[in-house]
């Protein structure tokens, strides 16, 4: 995630023990501040200039090797090591905030990469060489990397990217690149719908779009105004073993999954699945929201995280019968029948804002490092006519409200965490209510918010 800085960046880099790093010029300042705390050999720090390096490779700063210049005399053939790559080998890591704490590195294997890119690109979208995908989503996200880019690769299609999403320039870019397919997240669609209407709204070649998080309220408005025939809404846990795809082009659904899954009853305060007197879980009825569990078997293996203990925490045993295993997605879905489902919400200590997953534990830990804060509880709150949840932090001052410098606190937060994780709202409390087991009553705070 290119927004990560300082301690979070150090943690994420060291988590996978990298042998080398490639740093883009635009991110050089962020990496330079943490370089001494990352165990990468000085001869393996590669630099790429922020320009058309095929014409002008640029000049690497001291301590870096210019990757483009150093590559000029190398063979254009695939390296010998590529002959020994197998389905079960790790392809890359997708970093996720999971449900608590610092980012975890989810292992994405070559076999899963090929399955996911083929299912989205060939089965769901029927991509071909005449197609062009326009993607404004970051490629460190599974939607941008696996869904959009993977679909383009599967269909031998074109792939047009933009460094940062622009609502005002979106359709101009689509026309310029002659795009037939767009990748999205729900927030992106809302920004486009909020733009002033134009006579050119439907003047483009886009016939299909793929992504996640498009809310029912914006679904029909987007489809009608921009004349996009096929909305391929999907659900996939980048650190899990299941995915849903709206292949049949129904409205307001994430579609169906070929994997085995169930929705179970859960505790509304803790978010944990509920077990009956026999120790087994209860499936919810059609139309009722429930916690999504995905069966782990030979058909749907769980690659997990780099840390086996982190993986063990998301695996549930003896769910419906002795010996079965399920992946706990931490997400709430609703079964709408015919094998189709709707996404409802996220559980746990994570909420989604500006297309990013925000870990409340991480926000709390950073705020608690401020000398003027005694207690901090972070959570996501709903705002009318927006996607996801905005951050709110309830705090108790270390001394008094009069001594709390709000401007300095905001500057501190912006320096220590990504901008999307900085809480939009601050609630100051004299004392934080706790449960009988001394846990903060986050559910009550959310309700009051």
Language-model features, listed with the residues they occupy:
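AMP-binding/adenylate-forming catalytic core of the ANL superfamily
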Residues: 4, 10-11, 19-23, 236, ...
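Conserved pre-ATP/AMP-binding loop-to-beta segment of ANL
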Residues: 47, 63, 72-95, 102, ...
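Structural core segment of the AMP-binding/adenylate-forming
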Residues: 1-70, 415
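Conserved structural elements of the adenylate-forming
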Residues: 72-74, 78, 87, 106-128, ...
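Gly/Ser/Thr-rich phosphate-binding loop
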Residues: 154, 176-185, 193-268, 301-305
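Conserved AMP-binding/adenylation subdomain of ANL enzymes
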Residues: 114-132, 140-180
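ATP-dependent adenylate-forming carboxylate-activation enzymes
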Residues: 1-11, 25-31, 157-176, 358-363
